[in-house]
Amino acid sequence: MDNQSLKTHYSVYELANLKLKTLPSAPKNIWEQAKRENWKSQKRQGRGGGLEYELASLPIEVQNELLLKTTPEQTAVALQKIEETRPLASNEVWQLWDEASAKAQEQAKIKLGTMFAVANLVESGVNVLDAFRLVCGKENAERLKNNEKLLSVGSLKNWWYRVKDAPRQDWLPLMLNNSGKSSKNVAEIDEAAWQFFKNFYYSREKPSLAHSYEVLKQAAQYNGWRIPSRSSLKRKMERDVPKTEEVFRREGQYALSRLYPSQVRTVAMLQAMEWINGDGYQHNVWVRFPDGEIKRPKTWLWQDVRTRKVLAARTDKSENTDTIRLSLLDVISRYGLPKHLTIDNTRAAANKKMTGGVKNRYRYQVNENEVQGIIPALGIELHWTSIQFGKGRGQAKPIERAFSHGGLGDYVDKHLLLRGAYAGANAYEKPDYDGKNGAEQPVDYATFLMALEQGIQQWNNVGNRLTEICAGKSSYAEAFERDWAVAEKRPISQSQMRLLLTLHEEVRLNQDGTFYLNAGKIGTNKNRYESLALIGTSHKRVVVRYDPANLHDKVWVYAXTGEYLAEAEITEKAGFGDQMAGREHNKAMRNWVKHTEKAAKERAKAEEMELSNYAPAVEFEERFLEMLPEPVKAPQTQAEEVEYEEVLDFNTVRKVPKAVEVEAEEISEFNRDWEKGLELLKKSKGR
């Protein structure tokens, strides 16, 4: 609002309608006062004629009241004009206006009206202090009627000195400061000092503000810089440095990414047991394991993504492959195979025995020919939690919610059966048992397992869960039973069950069908296994699946491509002079040679018979049949007496039949006649 927008002349009827306290209420009486005090007038413009009186010729008290009375209307007009002609948001002042809340903007508009009233009075010749007093009195009269907080002259003064030298089109955003505090507290600091302070404070070492300010004072004294107080400097930091810049410079990329709005996902399209996720949880309870060691156990849990029910759990001293494998076995044997599975990229979860063959494992070296792990071998699609800026986003898994405050940490770790064994979530939350902070007593392993099972059941059965699927009406367990009843089932086969019951190891297969396993080795001593079915096979390397709890039982051998080959059994070393063990070994070897030889001969005989079926039959013309001699029959020989000879077989002398030379005269004569006939046949065809 500028001077030209102010109304400069009023008629007696307009003055009467304003109901000013400093003028009579009747138009006739106002006209008489104007005539008596000789107010300056001019002919009224427009219809009706008459006179209009100049505002400046009215008594000063009338002018002030009139200006205050008409300011709201003038303010409304000015606001509309400002909104139409306001600068772009690139203007720093107006950018703050665009970022302010609606409530802050409304309060700024109220303050703007008081500033326009002060400006009108000052421009009409009123002393600025009198203008503050007049505006404050009028504003407080209105606020008393509405039971609102009263305005002080000091606040008006601070607002006025904030805007009086600024262009009027920028007064509105300058009124955004909610308090009436003076702008004198704005930090006055040399640019070099400010840059020095920012480079020191906004660093990854994250120094405290107190320490940084002391360093700044020393540098300012040495360089002659002008610096404000610490509180003023803190306000300047809050005003001039965005929170995002502070987080990045002090904490890094990952912390900055945490400020970004999280993604909200829906699970409505999933079926129960279609997608599961798992993670390990370190319990805050001291447990005495069967071997006598006292540790805080770690449990691996699997959870259904759709309904959030915890499906199975296995616990041990640490997170390892066996707890993950066996807990997955519990889930699949009870509910069938899931289609998808999500886990963290940890050393235990992402090891090759569980995830071998997965190309995007990003842990351990990925080889093109490596053995398939249990999860991909079962046909389950594996998903990793994302890695952002060098750190995992484990919070993306739904099961993480179960580990937060009020979750399984309460239902299990603070179970009645575990009273006195609680270790506290951290060093500052250790319970004070009988005045001895941290004097907790461990519970036995069996008691802990009972508390774990009961705690998980209680967690699953809490009613009215506020998840997308439970919708505040059912528990995790109820939602799962309802949805799993109509879900697609994927039962597990016996061969798939064997994958879960066993671990695997890729080994070198010797020509004699033996191999060594690293599993169960002590020092350099390894278990040796053998399989007669693998002797002489073309497989150089094979995959051996074994039960880690029973390494002295049979193991199963597979090709590197996944085909099942044979079973193998562990062997024991025999003593150097153990003759009985030698005889048993020789007997087993002879039996194997005998049966292998017999099987080879049978196969050869069958192959010869099969080959004869494919040989073309020889057809002769009738005129050549008489030229072919009759087949010569083998002469009948009399039974000959079999002679034996003694042969040394290892440590035993055995009698075997002597080799008899075959007389081949009759056979050779037959061959000559047969070849002669074939030669005649060729000549006849050539003719």
UniProtKB/Swiss-Prot annotation:
SUPFAM superfamilies: Homeodomain-like (SSF46689), mu transposase, C-terminal domain (SSF50610), Putative DNA-binding domain (SSF46955), Ribonuclease H-like (SSF53098). Keywords: DNA excision, DNA integration, DNA recombination, DNA-binding, Transposable element, Transposition. GO terms for molecular function: DNA binding; transposase activity. Residues 398-417 bind DNA. Residues 8-74 form the HTH Mu-type domain. GO terms for biological process: DNA integration; DNA repair; DNA transposition. It holds the Pfam family Mu-transpos_C. The keyword DNA-binding applies. InterPro entries: DNA-bd_dom_put_sf (IPR009061), Homeodomain-like_sf (IPR009057), Mu-type_HTH (IPR003314), Mu_I-gamma (IPR015126), Phage_Mu_transposase (IPR004189), RNaseH-like_sf (IPR012337), RNaseH_sf (IPR036397), Transposase-like_Mu_C (IPR015378). This transposase is essential for integration, replication-transposition, and excision of Mu-like viral DNA. This is Mu-like prophage FluMu transposase A.
